[in-house]
Amino acid sequence: MKILVVGSGGREHALAWKLAQSERVQMVFVAPGNGGTARDQRLQNVAITDLNELADFVIREHVAFTVVGPEIPLAGGIVNLFRARGLKVFGPSKEAAQLESSKDFAKAFMKRHGIPTAEYETFSDAALAHADQLVFEGFAPKSA
């Protein structure tokens, strides 16, 4: 079987490396991959970052399933897109990925469900955009 691992970090390299050790796996593609995955003969980097083009690649190459590592393609809806096209993919939906990709969403979720978390404020006013430059005791600015 052929597998696609989406990402370029160490986590994706480790996943691809381990998957390639299975006798059932004939090829592991890594998109976009990194220098380490490029040197591993059991792995093949794929220079595609557009999600629709990646789905086309999966269909064309008869990839059995895709594993998505990084937050950016998850937040971009890769899982939703692949599922809509009938492709097998491991990862959270765009909506579920908001727990990691959006601090504002995650904080509101925790507050709504009574999950203990630090106090927070969310600002959308451009006049308050400088808040990320302020540093004082007890204040930890984060982008939403």
List each language-model region with its residue ranges.
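ATP-binding N-terminal substructure of ATP-dependent carboxylate-amine bond-forming enzymes
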Residues: 1-95, 100, 105
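Active-site nucleotide/adenylate-binding loops and adjacent lid/helix of ATP-dependent enzymes
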Residues: 4-5, 100-144
